[in-house]
Regions:
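A short, charged/proline- and glycine-enriched loop
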Residues: 22-31, 110, 210-213, 240
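A donor-sugar binding/catalytic signature common to diverse glycosyltransferases
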Residues: 93-107, 112-117, 122, 266-311
Length: 371
């Protein structure tokens, strides 16, 4: 029944879109579509600013609404109708997520669609790579809804990431472009900025961290499962280091009761990476951001076998970054204590995860859009 409803919806949208295209003239505008948030992301805002400078005749419009998986209400339907109307009269569309109207509708030839995704890296698998897996889409729904069809180009963070995105979106490799992300431009531009005020705020909030090296752990959320960090928390050397754990905002399963650990909810992920002396990642894009800031990065993957079966992995840190990746908490702690992450290790993480981020990604994406 669900599949039948989806088919009816798809063909109904196509019928309506035919008339929208017929009566909507193409204008010099770029439309930004997203299901990641109700507000334009920083990537979107930076691109809109660049469009205003590079192509001042182009106007920017945002159509953003947080879309939950397997959920659609009246607000979602209303937003899709607005997105359809916008697409019917646009010259350029930038998206950072899978958006139904982009993939299932037949667009005017004047419209160029660029997918920048919401993460410059894809350490874990997604899209067509994870069909019928616990955290993936069903193959029936993916085919009916033509998941990730309709893009002219997909922008990623590095050349190494290209084949993974090509597989996840079922696109030719030549359409996957390692131009980097706009937000990386800003991170690189602020790399040498003074952060004394931010540090003062942190030490005022967490006075017991003063005088200690700050180790920031940024675990990926496991849907319906707690982060496996009990051994790390128990064995961690708190006299020398402050362990700050920044859980995913949607993580409701991980509980940590050790009073020595800082479970931060005050500062942003980027602020914590900026303040970190050491960053611990697992399967998220946090490692890329840390590498852009030349931070020592380690990968902690105690549940890698289970996680790979549940979510799928494009990048196995134990294989790709063996010198700085650990499945055992004791080995990770020893490596941090020995400052084992070298400049070469950080450079390798940066090359593989965000090698296309050279500080000029925003302008390159806009140039691509205007070609």
């Amino acid at each position: 029944m669900k599949n039948l409803i989806l088919r009816i919806m798809k063909y109904g949208m196509r019928f309506l879109y035919f008339f929208m295209k017929l009566f909507t003239p193409v204008q010099d505008k770029v439309v930004f579509l997203s299901r990641q948030s109700d507000k334009p992301s920083e990537n979107f805002r930076m691109l809109a600013q660049e469009f205003s400078e590079y192509a001042p005749h182009m106007t920017s419009q945002f159509y953003c609404k947080l879309g939950l998986k397997n959920s659609m209400g009246l607000g979602d339907i209303a937003m899709m109708l607005r997105q359809m109307k916008a697409l019917a009269g646009a010259r350029v569309c930038i998206t950072e997520s899978y958006c139904v109207p982009i993939s299932i509708l037949h667009h005017k030839p004047e419209l160029k669609i660029i997918q920048i995704w919401h993460s410059m890296v894809a350490v874990k698998q997604f899209g067509w790579q994870t069909l019928d897996m616990p955290e993936g889409s069903s193959s029936a729904v993916a085919n009916i809804m033509q998941m990730h069809e309709g893009y002219d180009s997909v922008v990623v963070g590095s050349d190494f990431m290209r084949p993974f995105f090509a597989e996840a979106m079922r696109m030719p490799l030549e359409k996957i472009l390692p131009l980097g992300m706009p937000v990386a431009d800003r991170i690189l531009s602020e790399r040498n900025r003074n952060h004394d005020d931010l540090l003062a705020d942190f030490e005022k909030t967490y006075p017991h961290a003063v005088g200690k090296k700050r180790v920031v752990y940024l675990p990926t959320m496991r849907r319906g499962e707690a982060v496996d960090c009990a051994e790390l928390v128990e064995r961690f050397p708190y006299k020398e280091f402050a362990l700050i754990i920044k859980l995913h905002p949607l993580d409701r399963d991980t509980e940590i009761f050790n009073t020595h650990v800082i479970i931060d909810t005050v500062f942003s992920t980027e602020q914590m990476i900026t303040l970190a002396d050491v960053v611990i990642s697992d399967y998220s894009g946090a490692a890329a951001e840390a590498a852009l800031l030349d931070k020592p990065v380690y990968f902690f993957t105690p549940d890698i076998v289970r996680y790979a079966k549940r979510c799928g992995l494009n990048v196995d840190p134990l294989t790709v970054f063996p010198h700085i990746s650990f499945a055992m908490a004791e080995d990770l702690i020893n490596a941090i204590g020995e400052n084992r992450a070298t400049a070469e290790d950080i450079a390798l993480v940066r090359k593989y995860l965000c090698g296309g981020c050279d500080g000029h990604s925003t302008e390159k994406i806009v140039e691509l859009a205007m070609q």
